[in-house]
UniProtKB/Swiss-Prot annotation:
Keyword hit for GTP-binding: no
Alphabetical list of InterPro entries matching this protein: Herpes_BLRF2
Quaternary structure and interacting proteins, as annotated: Homooligomer; homooligomerizes and binds double-stranded DNA (dsDNA) cooperatively. Interacts with host CGAS. Interacts with PQBP1.
Organism whose genome encodes this protein: Human herpesvirus 8 type P (isolate GK18)
Protein known as: Tegument protein ORF52
Function: Plays a role in the inhibition of host innate immune system by targeting the CGAS enzymatic activity which is the principal cytosolic DNA sensor that detects invading viral DNA. Acts by inhibiting CGAS-DNA phase separation: directly binds double-stranded DNA (dsDNA) in a length dependent but sequence independent manner and is able to form DNA-induced phase separation in infected cells. DNA phase separation of ORF52 mediates disruption of liquid-like droplets in which CGAS is activated, thereby preventing CGAS activity.
Impact after mutating L91A: Does not affect DNA-binding; does not affect ability to inhibit host CGAS
Length: 131
């Protein structure tokens, strides 16, 4: 059996608890401010909804890339067959291994410096200019 601790917990008063809550509130505010001011916006924590949205988008992109590759291979097989029996035989022995990556679907993330380009200046009107 474990030995009891040397000193018992002291009962906190209402003032102590209020002071502790205000201290924790200030710390929480400072931490949130520090999180919001990170240099890279991708470093912030994701919410569950954002994670789920990215997961769904990634699965969709990879599925689309895989579907294109599967269709291409099946079309190749079907181009060689003429009769229904040949189709049945070809499909019976069909086994595919597909490798997909995000760059296959065209949905790969842009390079890090892609958003740092300068935008074109806004065009100005010549309404007040006399020719």
């Amino acid at each position: 059996m474990a030995a009891p601790r040397g000193r018992p917990k002291k009962d906190l008063t209402m003032e102590d608890l209020t002071a502790k809550i205000s201290q924790l509130t200030v710390e929480n505010r400072e931490l949130r401010k520090a999180l919001g001011s990170t240099a890279d916006p991708r470093d912030r924590p994701l919410t569950a909804t954002e994670k789920e949205a990215q997961l769904t988008a990634t699965v969709g992109a990879l599925s689309a890339a895989a579907a294109k590759k599967i269709e291409a291979r099946v079309r190749t097989i079907f181009s060689k067959v003429v009769t229904q029996k040949q189709v049945d035989d070809a499909l019976k022995g069909l086994s595919l291994r597909i490798d997909v990556c995000m760059s296959d679907g065209g949905t790969a993330k842009p390079p890090p410096g892609a958003n740092n380009r300068r935008r074109r200046g806004a065009s100005t009107t010549r309404a007040g200019v006399d020719d």
